[in-house]
A protein has these predicted regions:
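Alpha-helical cap/lid subdomain in secreted, periplasmic
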Residues: 3-153
Length: 153
């Protein structure tokens, strides 16, 4: 169980596309503090985003690197950590940090139809209010595929 910062250097160096899709576990049960905009080490969530997003282009110079925000989930408005951060706070950090490094961002929090914070949608498209079921994965694959096709045009 290693975080993104600890495992990205072990990925295939010949990868054509790198997709960073994280943040929901940090909100749900992560133990790293949020940190400040000045942080650049993996010791805080903000620092880890800067650490990862600044290093990926150097580690994978020929790859397309894209960042996805978390999907909506059940419990997203339950404050987490000492500071009471909500999922949307983690989403904001991911958006802002991807923009800082000029990385393409698919804002699934804003655009995806998989809004598991709605109990009806959660029952139809997820297994547990977070993880997509087969239909949810089909929808998510289409959303990501359309985004990647748009980058290639």
């Amino acid at each position: 169980d290693q975080d993104f910062c600890g495992r990205f250097s072990e990925m295939n160096p010949d990868a054509d596309i790198i997709v960073v899709f994280g943040g929901t576990n940090d909100h749900g049960h992560g133990d790293a503090p949020m940190g400040t905009e000045a942080d650049r080490t993996p010791d805080t969530f903000i620092g880890a985003c800067h650490f990862l997003f600044s290093r990926l282009p150097n580690q994978f110079p020929g790859a397309i690197i894209v960042v996805l925000t978390p999907l909506h989930r059940m419990g997203e408005n339950i404050p987490k950590g000492e500071s009471g951060w909500l999922l949307r706070d983690y989403v904001r950090v991911i958006r802002d940090t991807a923009a800082f490094y000029g990385l393409p961002l698919l804002d699934l929090f804003e655009t995806s139809v998989i809004r598991a914070n709605d109990p009806e949608i959660a029952a139809k498209l997820t297994t547990d209010g977070l993880h997509p079921n087969d239909l949810g994965h089909e929808i998510l694959a289409g959303e990501i595929g359309d985004f990647l096709k748009g980058l290639a045009e």
